[in-house]
Amino acid sequence: MEKLVTQQVQNVDPKQSEILNISEIPAENPTETPIISKQKLLEAGVYFGHKASQWHPKMAQFLLKKKRNETHIIDVLKTQKMLEIAYKLVEKFAQKGAKFIFVGTKKQAKKVIEEQAVRTNSIYVSGRWLGGTLTNNRTILSRLKTMENLEKQAAENFQGYTKKEKLAKQKQLAKLQKNLNGIKGLKDVPLFSLIMLVADPLKDAIAVKEARKKGIKIIGITDSNVDPSLVDFGIPANDDSTKSITLIFTVLADAIASAKGGKKLFAYQSDENIILPEDPEKELKQTRYRSNSFEKFARQKNTLKDSQVLKPNTEIQA
């Protein structure tokens, strides 16, 4: 049986550490396969930060000191370590019966949020976050009831209604499904058992604020421009790349699946078994100012050795 030891995560607020019971995370075994290899993290572009002028000072401990083209570079070793801790936290919560709400309304996150939430039988929001989803639960549950009634009527082809009435009801149902399909399960889940997994705490600030108000724990990606105290546990990484978000959220979903005896897709798998999506051309153009300087630097060195690009990680001490 895996031995549990008390560990201290230096870069996590003590209150957050207590909330998430980080002290009960299994000890690291250096001989084990890494949760995701450094090379695969680099391939996913998790290290791309924002322009230095946009940074948040609380993220300094996760960034390399040297900037390229005035752009911050996230320390991949720290991303790797924090992702592994997040995995173990999510797995532990899932084993204890927690339910999860995946949140990612930006274009780069939508697909993976939906896919991994459905895969793990979780709740999700990939479209517009409806204000009051968590804080005005009664209204949301009422809308869900309306949607269920309309779906029953639709199954009977809206029998008894005129053609005009049918069309109106079909439009109403389509709108409700677009906004509420992902949170159907919310009516069966007590809020105190929810854990929020969020792709971008800034983009989905309303969701984060509501979760905070209801005491829901939050685990999310924290890019170089994000205040890490917005979440209970942050994974320092690029939140503007489809590859980066897909990698991280598939790993988090793996933790839920593993807790239920399911298959892991990315976590602790060999690189050749991890197939990442191609980033859209528009997305590549948007992040080019962040990537060009680092890639040029890597080519000049003709290597991605830790000693040249990455600082040693001292995140966790047994």
Swiss-Prot record:
Keyword Ribonucleoprotein set for record: yes
InterPro entries cross-referenced by the UniProt entry: Ribosomal_uS2, Ribosomal_uS2_bac/mit/plastid, Ribosomal_uS2_flav_dom_sf
GO molecular function: structural constituent of ribosome
SUPFAM superfamilies, per the entry: Ribosomal protein S2 (SSF52313)
Family listed: Belongs to the universal ribosomal protein uS2 family.
Entries under HAMAP family matching the protein: Ribosomal_uS2_B
Protein name, UniProt field: Small ribosomal subunit protein uS2
Gene of this entry: rpsB
